UniProtKB/Swiss-Prot annotation:
It catalyses: a 1,2-diacyl-sn-glycero-3-phosphoethanolamine + L-serine = a 1,2-diacyl-sn-glycero-3-phospho-L-serine + ethanolamine; a 1,2-diacyl-sn-glycero-3-phosphocholine + L-serine = a 1,2-diacyl-sn-glycero-3-phospho-L-serine + choline. Keywords: Acetylation, Disease variant, Dwarfism, Endoplasmic reticulum, Intellectual disability, Lipid biosynthesis, Lipid metabolism, Membrane, Phospholipid biosynthesis, Phospholipid metabolism, Phosphoprotein, Transferase, Transmembrane, Transmembrane helix. Its main location: endoplasmic reticulum. Residues 57-72, 124-186, 238-286, 343-355, 405-473 are lumenal. GO terms for molecular function: L-serine-phosphatidylcholine phosphatidyltransferase activity; L-serine-phosphatidylethanolamine phosphatidyltransferase activity; transferase activity. This is Phosphatidylserine synthase 1.
Length: 473
């Protein structure tokens, strides 16, 4: 009787909720090409762990204390990643292998715990830790102390413009190409690019290196570096959207060239979701969610500059570019999970990677404020308030423009987005109308040209058991 009372049959809504959350948090691999790489190897990993620990415990020289600490930390990270492969969720991606994304999530958890640890240290202890990692940091200087910014802006020559195309300019270009691959929206990418330049203006009183000449901000940053990177990323997006992602298994490929091509394609997405951040029928909650996305994105970018300014290390130091690469790695599944949460009405919670990313962003900001109190004591509250209002106005203005363009000029094709009940399609809207063939309510003639394309998309998605735009592959 007690067991009957304690048990509860899951409703249809509960089943759908669990299914939708699992698809963004624990994506399954169904199109397995080589069985060996997807079989459980828990006993093998257990044996490897025990043997390797015994080897390092009894064979290595432990006479150097600093070497012991360093190797111990590396071993903890290594074996924590092994546990990540065994226990952590896959996330929304399965290519090139789910184990890779489990380790990415494991690294984000480690970084989160490291930031929590930093909160309980004082500034001298943090600097001692940095000097232990790299003794050369004792002699590091701030870029703002040795360089001048926004000087002689009225002098515009080709030599001066070309001199600004350094390694950082190429970093801007490729960085925005990757951001476009993640966001997949011209409007949102351009909004983030413009609002970041506004962010630099409002925080220029705290970080002098944010001061730039107008032609540097508008022409070099926004139009050339950022704009070129956005264009390249969106071109790659269109290329991936046109591709068919149901490749044959290695067993079905009989030529060496075909097998090599299939191996290379393993490092491309298993499925490509047509991203639609803004629907013409978007609710206020959707707009507010995009605004929150903008704020967190700007905060993460600001943390990059505040960290290297407060703890004094150059932009070329591994602590700087290593963090940027790491944040870029965990941003990919984060954006995917946040997009699913924002657009799928049946997804009631964010994914675990998205949750950890949000905590990391705010923890980095807290660390900067705690150890940079001398810097933040100069903060002009009015500038911060104006920045928030300006970002909100720019975001809402851009959203309105994108929605207006989508309603009047946007080319809408049938897609399988995150939210099935919010998917817009001219064919679906026509079928809901009342009318007969040949009447005014009949579909336009050009709709038939896309019929084969839409049917191919339906067949392709049905084979991979796609639900809400996430292919189980």
């Amino acid at each position: 009787m007690a067991s009957c009372v304690g048990s509860r049959t899951l409703s249809k809504d509960d089943v759908n909720y669990k299914m939708h959350f699992r698809m963004i948090n624990e994506q399954q691999v169904e199109d397995i090409t080589i069985d060996f790489f997807y079989r459980p190897h828990t006993i093998t990993l257990l044996s490897f762990t025990i043997v390797s620990l015994m080897y390092f415990a009894f064979t290595r020289d432990d006479s150097v204390p600093e070497d012991n600490i360093w190797r111990g930390i590396l071993s903890v990270i290594f074996f924590f990643l092994i546990i990540s492969v065994l226990a952590f969720p896959n996330g929304p991606f399965t290519r090139p292998h789910p184990a890779l994304w489990r380790m990415v999530f494991g690294l984000s958890v480690l970084y989160f715990l490291f930031l929590v640890f930093l909160l309980f240290l004082n500034f001298e202890q943090v600097k001692s830790l940095m000097y232990w990692l790299d003794p050369n940091l004792r002699y590091a200087t701030r870029e703002a102390d040795v360089m001048e910014y926004a000087v002689n802006c009225h002098v515009i020559t080709w030599e001066r413009i070309i001199s600004h195309f350094d390694i950082f300019a190429f970093g801007h270009f490729w960085g925005w190409a990757m951001k476009a691959l993640l966001i997949r929206s011209y409007g949102l990418c351009w909004t983030i690019s413009i609002t970041w330049e506004l962010t630099e203006l409002f925080f220029m009183h705290l970080l002098p290196n944010f001061a730039e000449c107008w032609w540097d901000q508008v022409i070099l940053d926004i139009l050339l570096c950022n704009g070129g990177g956005i264009w390249l990323g969106m071109v790659v997006c269109r290329f991936l959207e046109m591709r068919t992602y149901h490749w044959a298994s290695f067993k079905d490929i009989h030529t060496t060239t075909g097998k090599i091509k299939r191996a290379v394609l393993q490092f491309t997405p298993a499925s490509w979701t047509y991203v639609r951040w803004f629907d013409p029928k978007s609710s206020f909650q959707r707009v507010a969610g995009v605004y929150l996305f903008m704020i967190i994105w700007q905060l993460t970018e600001l943390n990059t500059f505040f960290l290297k300014h407060i703890f004094v290390f150059q932009a070329s130091h591994p602590l700087s570019w290593g963090r940027i690469l790491f944040i870029g790695g965990i941003t990919a599944p984060t954006v995917r999970q946040y997009y699913a949460y924002l657009t799928d009405t049946q997804c009631k919670r964010v994914g675990t990677q998205c949750w950890v990313f949000g905590v990391i962003g705010f923890l980095e900001a807290i660390v900067c404020i705690k150890f940079g109190q001398d810097l933040f004591s100069k903060t002009q509250i009015l500038y911060v308030v104006l920045w928030l209002l300006c970002v909100a106005f720019t975001t809402f203005l851009c959203l309105y423009g994108m929605i207006w363009y989508a309603e009047h000029y946007g080319h809408r094709e049938k897609t399988y987005s995150e939210c099935e009940d919010g998917t817009y399609s001219p064919e679906i809207s026509w079928h809901h109308r009342k009318g007969t063939k040949g009447s005014e309510d009949s579909p336009p003639k050009h709709a038939g040209n896309n019929e084969s394309h839409s049917s191919r998309r339906r067949n392709r998605h049905s084979k991979s058991k796609v639900t809400n735009g996430v292919g189980k592959k």
